Swiss-Prot record:
<dbReference type="GO" id="GO:0006412">
    <property type="term" value="P:translation"/>
</dbReference>
<comment type="subunit">
    <text>Heterotrimer of A, B and C subunits.</text>
</comment>
<keyword id="KW-0648">Protein biosynthesis</keyword>
<comment type="similarity">
    <text>Belongs to the GatC family.</text>
</comment>
<dbReference type="GO" id="GO:0050566">
    <property type="term" value="F:asparaginyl-tRNA synthase (glutamine-hydrolyzing) activity"/>
</dbReference>
<keyword id="KW-0547">Nucleotide-binding</keyword>
<comment type="function">
    <text>Allows the formation of correctly charged Asn-tRNA(Asn) or Gln-tRNA(Gln) through the transamidation of misacylated Asp-tRNA(Asn) or Glu-tRNA(Gln) in organisms which lack either or both of asparaginyl-tRNA or glutaminyl-tRNA synthetases. The reaction takes place in the presence of glutamine and ATP through an activated phospho-Asp-tRNA(Asn) or phospho-Glu-tRNA(Gln).</text>
</comment>
<dbReference type="Pfam" id="PF02686">
    <property type="entry name" value="GatC"/>
</dbReference>
<dbReference type="GO" id="GO:0006450">
    <property type="term" value="P:regulation of translational fidelity"/>
</dbReference>
<dbReference type="GO" id="GO:0005524">
    <property type="term" value="F:ATP binding"/>
</dbReference>
<keyword id="KW-0436">Ligase</keyword>
<dbReference type="InterPro" id="IPR036113">
    <property type="entry name" value="Asp/Glu-ADT_sf_sub_c"/>
</dbReference>
<dbReference type="GO" id="GO:0050567">
    <property type="term" value="F:glutaminyl-tRNA synthase (glutamine-hydrolyzing) activity"/>
</dbReference>
<protein>
    <recommendedName>
        <fullName>Aspartyl/glutamyl-tRNA(Asn/Gln) amidotransferase subunit C</fullName>
        <ecNumber>6.3.5.-</ecNumber>
    </recommendedName>
</protein>
<keyword id="KW-0067">ATP-binding</keyword>
<dbReference type="GO" id="GO:0070681">
    <property type="term" value="P:glutaminyl-tRNAGln biosynthesis via transamidation"/>
</dbReference>
<dbReference type="InterPro" id="IPR003837">
    <property type="entry name" value="GatC"/>
</dbReference>
Amino acid sequence: MALTPQDIGRIANLARLELSPGESERMLTQLNGFFGIVEKMQAVDTHGIAPLSHPVAVVRDVQLRLREDVASEPDQREANQRSAPAVERGLFLVPKVIE
């Protein structure tokens, strides 16, 4: 997938960025380079290869420091939301910023 200068213009418009022609060209080159790397990675046949828990485990025996995923602090949602200007059903209400 290669982007065109028109794609960069559209992305910049959606992100509300003003890019100079030089910045636009540099962005086009960088993004197309990134997509090129992604295409190379997608072309690699990984069927039959077991996933790694850590990439270093391939080259040496590593004791991973994994722990049980447990909450270590009490739920303080209500206390944290007391200073919010608007809350509804436990969620912060914010003004719409995207048209």
